[in-house]
Design a protein with these regions (language model features):
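C-terminal motif of bacterial Sec signal peptides marking the signal peptidase cleavage site
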Residues: 17-20
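Repetitive helical segments and hydrophobic/amphipathic motifs
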Residues: 11-12
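Contiguous, structured surface segment used for ligand recognition
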Residues: 22-166
């Protein structure tokens, strides 16, 4: 009986140890990428793209949806930058609709190089999610509502491919246990 109890307790202890080791690797990956959700593939490079007043956004198609996404990106970065990025047919930050069955409808491929950033997707939804990842890669001061003068707007070089694992998205907001203002709920939804 004692031997059985000892063997059982050792098995439980070893299972806990191995489980802890595995989850620690996932946490290291999350800390390294600092992107939510963690993309399917991420490869970092030693280069960096720097946003300046001359930086432009390029749209390969004259789609109203892509123009809306470019306006959204400008709306997010304008307060901290103090200027808007011009939207043209070819630009330093290029949004391109392609035909890649591996990406699905909401997947994207984001490549940050020294001279250009490209976001490619099959549908505008994929471009939008690529822009969300790009916003997370900018320095944290980009969220400021006041112009930030002493910040270098550098984005680390990377090659990122991601698509949703499931066809739905969800997150729990428990408003019955804590009161949230309308603005907090809207911000929460935007973070999805």
């Amino acid at each position: 009986m004692k031997n059985t109890l000892l063997a059982l307790s050792m098995a439980v202890a070893l299972t806990g140890l191995f489980t802890q080791c595995q989850s620690s690797g996932n946490n290291q990956q999350a800390e390294q990428t600092a992107l939510i959700p963690i993309p399917q593939t991420v490869t970092y490079a030693e280069t960096a793209f720097k946003i300046s007043q001359g930086t432009t956004i390029g749209l390969e198609s004259s789609s109203a949806e892509l123009l809306s996404i470019a306006d959204y990106f400008n709306h997010k970065v304008n307060p901290a930058l103090g200027y808007s990025l011009e939207v043209k047919e070819q630009g330093d930050i290029q949004f391109s609709l392609i035909n890649n069955p591996d990406l699905g409808n909401e997947g994207y491929h984001l490549k940050v190089e020294k001279r250009q950033i490209s976001i490619e997707a099959n549908q505008p939804a994929g471009i939008f999610y690529g822009v969300q990842t790009l916003l997370q890669m900018l320095p944290k001061e980009i969220r400021s509502q006041q112009v930030q003068h002493d910040v270098e707007w550098a984005i680390a070089g990377a090659d990122i491919t991601d698509k949703p694992q499931f066809p739905w998205r969800g997150l729990m907001l428990d408003v019955s246990r804590h009161w949230f203002t309308k603005e907090e709920v809207i911000r929460f939804i935007d973070e999805l």
